């Protein structure tokens, strides 16, 4: 969701984490932030404590991030290119949709509500609703389980982040990679079913896939 559908990774999380780290006397570079984008919050805590030392208070850091995010969100966060058109097409076509996001339910609901997108999805699975976050595939397998008549071979996972991309690959579903800010390793690039520059290219791709599968 963050950085794929909504430009919240760039405009919200990058800024809030930078400020929250600075308040504890640390500098967070964009390059360092990009290395853990999309990972579950427990993993992020481990990474930050290793980087900043045992005195780093991750609970305070995370609380401040949410406070800063709420302030930024109140001013509005734009959608990523092609996101609205894609969601409209999927709904009109009767194609099931489910968000699998590391972001917790409270912030997810706020983001989607602010952008009038909450009703665009059949279901949502958030980071605080799985036992193991990305890059573990649990979140995407839980998304798939919401639709009893859909096999994983029929499902597409759209991802912009490295951790989420690995989760998509390991889920057994087909990964559609939409690169944005996050570092993407050679494995996810080589194993991606499709790489598109932004979501404006997704509709044509899905139409082509439907034509291909129905002609087999």
Where are these regions (language model features)?
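Conserved phosphate-coupling serine/threonine residues in phosphotransfer and NTP-handling enzymes
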Residues: 4, 101-103
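Active-site neighborhood of HAD-like aspartate-dependent phosphohydrolases
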Residues: 1-34
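Metal-dependent phosphoesterase signature
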Residues: 23, 27-28, 47-85, 93-95
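Asp-based, Mg2+/Mn2+-dependent phosphohydrolase catalytic module
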Residues: 88-91, 104-216
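Short, flexible loop segments at the rims of nucleotide/cofactor-binding pockets, characterized by
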Residues: 74-78, 102, 172
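Alpha-helical elements of Rossmann-like donor-binding domains used by nucleotide-donor carbohydrate transfer enzymes
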Residues: 14-15, 43, 47, 64, ...
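Hydrophobic/aromatic residues within well-ordered alpha-helical segments
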Residues: 12, 37-41, 61-69, 104
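Helix-loop "lid/cap" segments that line or gate small-molecule binding pockets
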Residues: 17-22, 40-55, 111, 143-146
